[in-house]
Amino acid sequence: MFLSIMLISYLYGLIFPLLAHYATASNEDVGVSVSRIYFANILGSAAGPLVIGFWLFEITSFDNIMMIITIITMFTTAIAYYIMDSGKRNLSFQKKATYIAIMLILLFSGSNLYKGLYERLFYKTNYTTAKKFSNVIENRSGIISTTSTDGGFADFIYGGGMFDGTFNIYPEKNKNNNNIDRAYKIPTLHENPVELLSIGLSGGAWVRVASLYPDIKKIDVIEINPGYLELIKRYPDVNPILNDQRIQYFTDDGRRWLLRNPDKKYDFILMNTTWHWRNQINNLVSIEFLQLCKLHLKNNGVMYFNATSSPDIPFTATKVFKKVAVYKNFIAVTDGELIQNPETRARNLKKFVINDRPVFNFSNPESKEAFDALVMHSNEDISAHENELHDKYRLYLITDDNLASEFKTGKRIYSPEAAWKKIFAH
């Protein structure tokens, strides 16, 4: 693989100096000729991301784009060869036929040249021709793919090659391959959530669960990649959210939308954040972003988001909110009060309805088990505990600038409290 990369890089590296040599006119100043080549190079480099990245990727697939580029390149090569030396060079019939044949081969074999490319990149050494994505959606915001699962579980979703959830909406253990019980925590945290904001959509399972709670009258969803809406159409468990009149969708960046809508306030903000170590995730878990979200919460409002097991994120949240509670890898934060009464949590959970039937079926042991676990989980405030962990493990306060969430927090080897000088002083 490395040899092939080296060879390709070597061949690409030859292009510019060869152009500078052959395209320099002998009857004019060399500097002028070379400057034109540089200008064309800069123009093409700037136009490439704009035309391909922002336009073509939005209207067609990667393999089609590669075919378009190949055809344009070959036509450009033919034209350049023809006009070189004022058209004095005459191509033989055999050369013309060979060139046309190559173009036709590339044109009709293009769909096979990149067949299974995304699967090869994803599975790497484990790739086989049997491993295929069940859905692939490409646009300028990224690549969304899904894989089918065994055992009756919901399909897995991958955004940019990383796990991004599943389509499961049922909390029972034999179906719950995405820990969707975390979404059912919403009314066990806030006593009366009426208006909800979801930052991120993915496969729609979380928004679908929120829509099953009848007391929620309004749901605003911010999703930067419109491809997820197309994907949701294909899955009946979640596609009812596309026709739910309570739900409004905004294709935008979460932070930008919040800044542009300072008057919007919600009872509940939900954010199923991606892995804390991924590129740019710092912008969704920093103290500045949490402060921005706090401005969009009503009195006693709750923000509930995925810390993905990062110890730095709960600690950062304690510097913005008075109360911080943990459920699995999620944290709930508020300046008000979280529900502490199990009876209230149970009453609210019983309101979840799907297809005119309660979500939690007490005649089903697994459904009853999921219900009981949600009811009995305490919403204990861990703020003081987080401060203790900070002192012990040197947790980081995540800011927009320090990228602390994207790097592992190491355990502090040296502790001043355990220094030899202090020990012998006693």
Predicted feature locations:
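Surface-exposed polar/charged interaction patches
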Residues: 351, 355, 377-380, 399, ...
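Alpha-helical transmembrane segments of multi-pass membrane proteins
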Residues: 1-347, 396-426
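Short flexible/disordered coil segments
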Residues: 286, 364-371, 390-398
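Short amphipathic alpha-helical segments that mediate assembly, nucleic-acid/protein binding
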Residues: 98, 367-368, 382, 390-391, ...
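Flexible, glycine-/basic-rich loop-and-beta segments that form/coincide
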Residues: 334-376
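A cross-taxonomic marker for long C-terminal extensions/tails that follow the last structured domain
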Residues: 375-377, 382-404
